[in-house]
Amino acid sequence: MADFVEAARLDQVPPGTSMAVTIAGKEVAIFNVDGHIHAIDDACPHAGGSLGIGKLDGRVVTCRFHGMRIDVTNGCFPASSGFAVASYPVMVIAGTIRVAIGPLEPAS
């Protein structure tokens, strides 16, 4: 079962912004879309650019290297069905963003 690991403080990621963090050795991009926090793999699959420093427009981030666009709410590519980066469960507790990396146990 994956544990939720502290990734950042909520005040570090105001609405409309993003950041890249390392969680358990994994690079993850965190986004605040209208007060909702989302986490996906930080590396753009096209050229490995950091999505955490990409341009966020609504729920879509554009990689600054080659313009690849990814929906941060689910990791999917809006213009290409079937392609996605990993997305991760997120919880915000007492102003702390926590992200689960790895498999989760199914709810019982």
Ranges and model annotations:
Residues 1-58, 71-72, 76, 84-108:
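N-terminal pre-ligand scaffold of iron-sulfur
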Residues 81:
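Binuclear metal-ion centers of metallo-dependent hydrolases, dominated by the metallo-beta-lactamase
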Residues 44, 63-66:
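Short cysteine clusters
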